[in-house]
């Protein structure tokens, strides 16, 4: 079994972390996970897929974004644009050859346009906001409070708001509301259930394992990265 590597990259004055497998392989895929609470639900499957890839001789790196996990940066200070810069910086510093993104990760993967890109189930930013707002409204209702989507969005114009356990600032909310995955020249897009068989674990209440899903992701990434160079 391939041992994990704990890697660092530096952005905006902070040392941020990545989880890596496969060492200095000829192919090195930067994996951008889903954003916010979806990130936590998919992490186990992505790590399993990375181990599988390493067993195939393919290197991979799972980025930890500023404001997430062990980062010392504050999530409320982040925006989609700052995360785009982060992905760009990480890809350069760690010398990756390919970029793979899942769900909302496809909203921040577009700065390294010369690299081959792979996306699984890309989503618009507005869809992510709506899902998180529904969660917040449901939680408020259980607590005996009443708040609307319009009220939350108005609050978000001037101050950070908590959505699904994430404290998001005005810049993040504003950019998410209009964000769509950008078209790229060297792009492969995969649909869940058609191109890759698996369950939408990002919708589950808790993180779950799915070894078959992880293996399917790894097999597709292996074929794709081999076919498009690197």
Predicted regions and their residues:
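Hydrophobic anchor at the start of a short beta-strand
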Residues: 58-60, 96-97, 115-117
